A protein has these predicted regions:
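Glycine-rich anion/phosphate-binding loops
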Residues: 96-105, 140
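Acidic (Asp/Glu)-rich catalytic clusters
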Residues: 68, 89, 107-114, 144
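Anionic-ligand binding region
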Residues: 129-144
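Aromatic/hydrophobic pocket-lining residues that form the small-molecule binding cavity
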Residues: 2, 6, 60, 139
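N-terminal active-site wall of soluble small-molecule enzyme domains
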Residues: 19-22, 26-91, 100-102
């Protein structure tokens, strides 16, 4: 069943790439593995999926320890500063850096672990109090720090 579902997803990705004039290899499929058992991840891994997204630090670290080491892990959920130490160096990309404090904490932890951590910055452009994300006026200071000083953060977007 998973094999057929994966074929359908791949077909849809290819169709979207064709419509957008992009090559399939320019697009990364991230299988969201949150709440899924290790056995299901192992099955999709055998089908060729090697990039997974988790939204909970504890689940990510548990799965990281027992699944193949060539899996590329992405942190896709809200990340608290007190949990940064558990995922820096284990994740290829942190998708939800939503504050300067969080960026600074990731930077410090990456320095401790002597690694560079790729991140995506989440910006709250609507400036809604109920939403996560940097305020628009915080983006420039983060960008200036990243440009003017050598850092352990690689801001992908």
């Amino acid at each position: 069943m998973l094999k057929e579902q994966l074929k359908e997803v791949e077909h849809r990705i290819q169709a979207a790439c064709d419509r957008a004039g992009r090559k399939r290899e320019e697009v990364t499929l991230i299988a969201v593995s949150k709440t899924k058992p290790v056995s299901m991840i192992e099955e999709t891994y055998q089908l060729g999926i090697h990039v997974y997204g988790e939204n909970k630090v504890q689940e990510l670290t548990e799965k990281y320890e027992i699944l193949p080491k060539d899996i590329e892990w992405h942190m896709i959920g809200h990340l608290q500063t007190n949990k940064v130490k558990y995922i820096v160096g284990k994740t290829a990309l942190i998708h939800s850096v939503d504050s300067l404090k969080l960026a600074e904490t990731i930077e410090k932890e990456a320095a401790k672990k002597n690694c560079v951590q790729d991140i995506l910055v989440e910006v709250n452009v609507a400036q809604e109090e109920s939403k996560f994300g940097l305020k628009v006026d915080e983006v420039i200071p983060l960008s200036l720090i990243h440009i003017s000083e050598p850092t352990r953060l690689d801001v992908i977007s």
